[in-house]
Structure formats: structure tokens, C-alpha cells
A protein has these predicted regions:
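Gly/Ser-rich helix-loop-strand patches that form or flank binding pockets
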Residues: 1-9, 97-135
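Conserved beta-strand termini and adjacent loop/short-helix elements that scaffold enzyme active sites
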Residues: 6-8, 48-50, 81-85, 134
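Structured loop/turn residues at secondary-structure junctions
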Residues: 9, 22-23, 83, 107
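Generic structural signal for helix capping and beta-alpha/helix-loop junctions
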Residues: 12-13, 55, 88-90, 112
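Small/aliphatic-rich secondary-structure junction motif
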Residues: 13-61, 65-81, 94, 100, ...
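Short acidic active-site motifs
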Residues: 86-91, 118-119
Length: 135
């Protein structure tokens, strides 16, 4: 199941997907959903990978490159964007009104979400564009 939150949607707007990618289990499902949406609406995908420090984990880079390869093989215009910073804040900063954010749901336990928070929830609360959270 997935959650689609629509904020400031304009049917006349030329959209791109902002696909948030890391090495979490939800990323592969988000990539597949992103491909379906991109194909259905004939739009391109910006694959965003954010690391808290300059050293990107191998899993992050690998996931981003696999996503780009999968999307391009599906006939979708895709480009990778690598940024350093807080993941939630960076996703919100990069996302513009012509983006539809697609990201995997958090895999944290309810207790961890309460104390630490959740990237998808943080993004959802702070972004001004549509967002699809894939579970």
C-alpha cells in the first residue's frame, strides 16, 4: 500500500519525479513505482541520493546507479543527483513545485519513529509539492 499526498498540484504543469534513493528496503519498491508513474505520464526522473557526510555509503551509490539503469532501460529520462546534508531537509530543498516526490516508507519501529522521527513524515510535513510514499 502507498500514500499519495497532493499539495499544489497543477494539471497544466510539466512535472518531473524526484525519486529519493538510499540503501533501505523501501527504495526498490519506490523505484518500481517511480518507473510506472514516469511511464504513465511520460515524465523524467531526478534520482536524489543524500548522505549526511562526504563519504557516501556504497549501498547509497549502488542503489542510485541501479535506479538510473532500471529507469533508462524502461525508456525513462533519468539523472542522478548526489547531495550532502540532512536527508529530509535536502529533499525538501531540492524539490520544486514541478516535482512529484516518490520515496520509500520508513522501516523504523513505531517507538523509533516517536523518538527519532521518520524521513518520509518529515518530508511530507515540509514539502510544497505532491509526494508518494511507497510501502
Amino acid at each position: 500500500s502507498s500514500i499519495f499526498i497532493v499539495k499544489n498540484f497543477d494539471p497544466s504543469q510539466d512535472y518531473r519525479i524526484l525519486l529519493a534513493v538510499d540503501d533501505s528496503p523501501g527504495t526498490s519498491r519506490a523505484i518500481k513505482y517511480g518507473a510506472r508513474v514516469a511511464q504513465a505520464f511520460n515524465i523524467g526522473v531526478d534520482i536524489l541520493t543524500v548522505s549526511k557526510n562526504e563519504e557516501f555509503r556504497d549501498g547509497y551509490k549502488g542503489a542510485a546507479h541501479r535506479a538510473a539503469k532500471f529507469l533508462r532501460r524502461s525508456g525513462i529520462d533519468a539523472k542522478n543527483i548526489f547531495k550532502v546534508g540532512d536527508p529530509s531537509d535536502t529533499i525538501v530543498e531540492i524539490a520544486t513545485n514541478n516535482h512529484i516526490i516518490i520515496m520509500g516508507a520508513s522501516t523504523r519501529s513505531p517507538l523509533k519513529k516517536f523518538f527519532i522521527g521518520s524521513k518520509p513524515l518529515d518530508v511530507m510535513e515540509n514539502c510544497s509539492c505532491p509526494i508518494l510514499i511507497v510501502k
